[in-house]
């Protein structure tokens, strides 16, 4: 229900940014034909939930989020989706929603596991903690290294699927 509610919020936002009378004075900066969505945790599930109901979102990424709202059994109309997660989200891992929804994704898809990460590493918190002098002593990766990995894969995914720029990383 939470991811579905966030999907409705995103659809409202897209309506307000791309409609005939945009609510933001810089809405002309939004490329209305190349919209992608990425999210962490429930936001990653919201990316898939939004794609299930809104064809304007052409590509999506779930960064370490449980699929509380399942991907529809008939998929996402062939649109690309990237799963980027910690080792607990490996195939056959502790979150079986990834295994279930992987089978439902019907377009280009990748499932990437980032070794040495925890759920929180897919957000800004590990970078901010490092900058504050409070790094996680149990994490083998620095916040900056984790951020570099996330930036590289997220950028490559959207460049490939929204800009049609080949990406050897993927």
Please provide the spans of the model-predicted regions.
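Divalent metal-coordination and catalytic microenvironments
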Residues: 10, 35, 111, 158
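Gly/Ala-rich beta-loop-alpha elbow adjacent to hydrolase catalytic centers
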Residues: 38-43, 47
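Conserved hydrolase catalytic core segment
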Residues: 49-58
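The feature captures the conserved acid-bearing segment of alpha/beta-hydrolase catalytic domains
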Residues: 58-121
């Amino acid at each position: 229900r939470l991811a579905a509610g966030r999907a409705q919020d995103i659809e409202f936002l897209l309506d307000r940014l791309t409609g005939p009378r945009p609510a933001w004075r810089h809405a002309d900066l939004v490329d209305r034909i190349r919209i992608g969505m990425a999210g962490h945790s429930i936001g990653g599930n919201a990316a898939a939930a939004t794609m299930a109901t809104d064809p304007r979102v052409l590509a999506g990424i779930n960064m370490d989020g449980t699929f509380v709202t399942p991907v529809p059994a008939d998929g996402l109309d062939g649109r690309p989706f990237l799963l980027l997660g910690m080792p607990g989200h490996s195939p056959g891992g502790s979150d079986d929603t990834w295994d279930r929804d992987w089978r439902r994704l019907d377009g280009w898809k990748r499932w990437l596991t980032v070794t040495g990460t925890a759920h929180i590493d897919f957000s800004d918190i590990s970078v901010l903690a490092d900058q504050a002098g409070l790094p996680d002593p149990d994490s083998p990766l620095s916040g900056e290294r984790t951020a570099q990995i996330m930036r590289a894969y997220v950028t490559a995914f959207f460049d490939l699927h929204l800009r049609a720029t080949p990406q050897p990383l993927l």
